[in-house]
Swiss-Prot record:
Protein's gene: recO
GO terms (BP aspect): DNA recombination; double-strand break repair
GO cellular component, one term: bacterial nucleoid
PANTHER family linked: DNA REPAIR PROTEIN RECO (PTHR33991:SF1)
Keywords carried by this UniProt record: DNA damage, DNA recombination, DNA repair
Protein name per its UniProtKB record: DNA repair protein RecO
Gene3D superfamilies: Nucleic acid-binding proteins, Recombination protein O, C-terminal domain
Listed Pfam families: RecO_C (PF02565), RecO_N (PF11967)
InterPro entries: ARFGAP/RecO (IPR037278), DNA_rep/recomb_RecO_N (IPR022572), NA-bd_OB-fold (IPR012340), RecO (IPR003717), RecO_C (IPR042242)
NCBIfam families in the record: reco
Functional description taken from the UniProt entry: Involved in DNA repair and RecF pathway recombination.
Family per record: Belongs to the RecO family.
Organism: Staphylococcus aureus (strain Newman)
Length: 250
């Protein structure tokens, strides 16, 4: 059966010498794996059209199991995401988070909206690292956990100025008054905890101007990755490349 669906490529894996397996997130919020024959060959014209983040109309044959890609009518290549290794790596982290949050057969229209929002924000100049944090905050529940950043997990104190870190012992933010009860709590700036709470709760259509200091973004990114490792056992391939890039700069 010949299918036509708009979507965004969220995963691309080389298969053999000349083929690729791509996964698109279609406009209905479903993952669609497709075999792209000879996509690594320049002459087929599919090499550029099967890159990560390509948004287009995908035409493919679908019977049982994996479909076979025929062609792509590209709407946007998202070129700006490919121009900088850090930008493309954090965008890939966002895409990987969404892809891994979904099981086969899941339908999640919000994930499609989230991905489109994030890619557009990155292209318009918003920090790709910050956008990866937004995605990971929004996807937490799909990985089976949540995190509270606006009150002390020990005392219930919700005075934001008193919160100084995150406690894995008590599974939540911790205040300076209770800090002695967990000497291994991850110390965070008060602003980091405040912004994590805001971004976690704020609908994406209300996120207009997102100008946050890089040190705060780094803190948010680090604690979010720790939460995913601790609570969901998740290690992201995209993050490995980011770590390698950071080591090269040292």
């Amino acid at each position: 059966m010949l299918m036509r669906q708009k979507g965004i490529i969220i995963k691309a894996v080389d298969y053999g010498e000349s083929d690729k397996i791509i996964t698109i997130l279609n406009e209905h919020g479903a993952k669609v794996p497709l075999m792209a024959r000879r996509a690594k060959k320049v002459k087929t014209g599919l090499q550029a059209q099967t890159q990560l983040f390509v948004y287009g109309l995908f035409i493919y044959n679908q019977w049982r199991g994996m479909g076979t890609l025929n062609s792509v009518d590209v709407i946007s290549q998202h070129y700006k995401l490919q121009m900088d290794l850090y930008v493309s790596s954090y965008a890939a982290l966002a895409a990987e988070t969404i892809e891994r949050s979904m099981d086969e057969g899941d339908i999640a229209p919000y994930n499609y909206q989230l991905l489109q929002f994030v890619l557009e924000k990155i292209e318009s100049g918003t920090s790709a690292q910050l956008m990866s944090v937004v995605v990971m905050l929004k996807c937490m529940k799909r990985f089976g956990f949540t995190a509270s950043f606006n009150r002390c997990a020990v005392s219930g104190n919700d005075t934001q100025a008193d919160l100084i870190g995150y406690s894995f012992k008590f599974d939540g933010a911790i205040s300076r008054q209770e800090a002695s009860k967990d000497v291994h709590a991850v110390i965070l700036s008060n602003k980091t905890l405040y912004l994590l709470d805001v971004l976690q709760k704020l609908p994406i259509d209300k996120m207009n101007s997102l100008n946050i200091h890089q040190e705060i973004i780094d803190e948010m990114s680090d604690i979010i990755l720790m939460l995913y490792r601790e609570y969901a056992g998740m290690f992201f391939k995209s993050q490995k490349l980011i770590n390698q890039l950071k080591r090269l700069e040292q």
